[in-house]
Amino acid sequence: MPNFSGNWKIIRSENFEDLLKVLGVNVMLRKIAVAAASKPAVEIKQEGDTFYIKTSTTVRTTEINFKIGEEFEEQTVDGRPCKSLVKWESENKMVCEQRLLKGEGPKTSWTRELTNDGELILTMTADDIVCTRVYVRE
């Protein structure tokens, strides 16, 4: 079983602003979010299939607790409440499908994958826009 536990720092990000744009975040808030999210602190604690993930930026801190295969509530990257379900796609990759609790919006999901060279790859998808963020352990 992969070990996602640790404190992670970002080394690369692609399409984050495009993702926020397709989610309907206005230009001013996008600029603030992109600047704040350029150096997030990510802490992951894992016990088997149970996860705690805390992501801290200068603007916002989010915390989620979940178990693989059990639905839970969280927020989409733009802050809308949703139900999420995480499953293992492969030995080192988890996939989360999100369903908005109310209203309409783009179909959103995320994945987290550990690579053989120790990187954590987070992908966030809204409709056909994919944002990729790559982290290494601190």
UniProtKB/Swiss-Prot annotation:
One Gene Ontology term, aspect cellular component: nucleus
Coiled-coil regions listed in the entry: none
Keyword set includes tRNA processing: no
Annotated motif Nuclear localization signal, positions: 21-31
Top-rank taxon, per record: Eukaryota
Sites where the protein binds all-trans-retinoate: R133, V134, Y135
Keywords: Cytoplasm, Endoplasmic reticulum, Isopeptide bond, Nucleus, Retinol-binding, Transport, Ubl conjugation, Vitamin A
Gene Ontology annotations of biological process type: fatty acid transport
SUPFAM superfamilies linked: Lipocalins (SSF50814)
Subcellular location as annotated: Cytoplasm; Endoplasmic reticulum; Nucleus
Role noted for this protein: Transports retinoic acid to the nucleus. Regulates the access of retinoic acid to the nuclear retinoic acid receptors.
Subunit structure and binding partners: Interacts with importin alpha, RXR and RARA.
Domain remark text: Forms a beta-barrel structure that accommodates hydrophobic ligands in its interior.
Official protein name in the record: Cellular retinoic acid-binding protein 2
